[in-house]
Amino acid sequence: MANVQKIGKAVYKGPSVVKEIIYGITLGFAVGGLWKMHHWNNQRRTKEFYDLLEKGEISVVVEDE
């Protein structure tokens, strides 16, 4: 039974600095990529809006009836 207790007991050695840095960098790249895709989407929508406005397909002026 003494061997079972030694195997089952987890020893906390403290935080791993290298592991924490790798986690931080990975999380930063993932969130940064999502943020960049969000901005690319906004840029595309703005460009499409101004292209349609220039072609005359849409208007920002309300038509009177």
From Swiss-Prot:
- UniProt key word Ribosomal protein: no
Q: Where in the cell is it found?
A: Mitochondrion inner membrane
Question: What is the protein's given name?
Answer: Putative cytochrome c oxidase subunit 5C-4
> Which keywords, in A-to-Z order, does the entry hold?
Membrane, Mitochondrion, Mitochondrion inner membrane, Transmembrane, Transmembrane helix
**Stated role:** This protein is one of the nuclear-coded polypeptide chains of cytochrome c oxidase, the terminal oxidase in mitochondrial electron transport.
Q: Transmembrane region positions?
A: 20-37
- PANTHER family for the chain: CYTOCHROME C OXIDASE SUBUNIT 5C-2-RELATED, CYTOCHROME C OXIDASE SUBUNIT 5C-4-RELATED
User: Which family does the record claim for this protein?
Assistant: Belongs to the cytochrome c oxidase subunit 5C family.
Got a GO cellular component term for this one? Answer: mitochondrial inner membrane
Identify the domain of life: Eukaryota
